[in-house]
C-alpha cells in the first residue's frame, strides 16, 4: 500500500482471504445520516508544464471527457437516490480537478440524506460496482459480463 499511496486505501485480513484496495475514488463515505460519493470520470497524465488549471481547461474543452463525466455523475445520482430521502440527492461540488502524483482526475462530489433504516449493506448494494468502473448502462453491462465471463468477478477494481 505504501508503494501505491492513495487517499482511499484499506486492507482487510481474514482467516481465509485478504483484500487490499488502493483507489483515488471515494465510492462511499457515510457521515451520520449523510452519504457522499465522488465519482471520477476523466483522467489526464501529468506532463512537465501541466497544472490543475491546464487540466481543468483540457477536461472542459474535451467533449468526450465531459459527456462521459456527466453520464457517470447521472448514474451515481440515480444510485444514491435509491437509498436517500427523495429530493435530498444533490451535487455539492461539480467538475473539479484533483491532483495526484502522476495524473489529474475530473471529479464531482454528490451527497444525499439516507432513508431511515438504511443499512450499509443496502447502500453498498445500491452503489456497487461504481459507475466509473463499469460504465453505463450499469445493469446491462453486468448482464453482458456475466454472459461472457466464466467466473464472477467478486472483488475487482474496487468493487
Name each model feature, range by range.
Residues 1-159:
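Extended alpha-helical targeting/anchoring segments
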Amino acid at each position: 500500500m505504501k508503494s501505491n499511496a492513495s487517499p482511499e486505501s484499506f486492507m482487510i485480513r481474514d482467516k481465509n482471504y485478504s483484500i487490499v484496495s488502493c483507489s483515488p475514488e471515494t465510492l462511499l463515505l457515510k457521515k451520520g445520516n449523510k452519504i457522499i460519493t465522488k465519482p471520477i470520470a476523466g483522467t489526464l497524465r501529468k506532463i512537465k508544464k501541466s497544472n490543475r488549471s491546464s487540466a481543468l481547461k483540457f477536461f472542459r474543452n474535451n467533449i468526450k471527457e465531459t459527456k462521459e463525466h456527466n453520464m457517470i455523475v447521472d448514474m451515481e445520482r440515480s444510485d444514491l437516490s435509491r437509498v436517500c430521502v427523495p429530493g435530498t440527492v444533490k451535487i455539492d461540488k461539480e467538475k473539479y480537478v484533483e491532483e495526484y502524483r502522476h495524473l489529474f482526475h475530473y471529479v464531482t462530489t454528490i451527497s444525499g440524506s439516507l432513508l431511515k433504516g438504511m443499512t450499509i449493506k443496502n447502500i453498498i448494494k445500491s452503489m456497487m460496482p461504481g459507475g466509473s468502473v463499469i460504465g453505463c448502462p450499469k445493469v446491462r453491462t453486468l448482464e453482458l459480463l456475466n454472459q461472457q465471463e466464466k467466473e464472477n468477478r467478486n472483488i475487482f477494481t474496487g468493487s
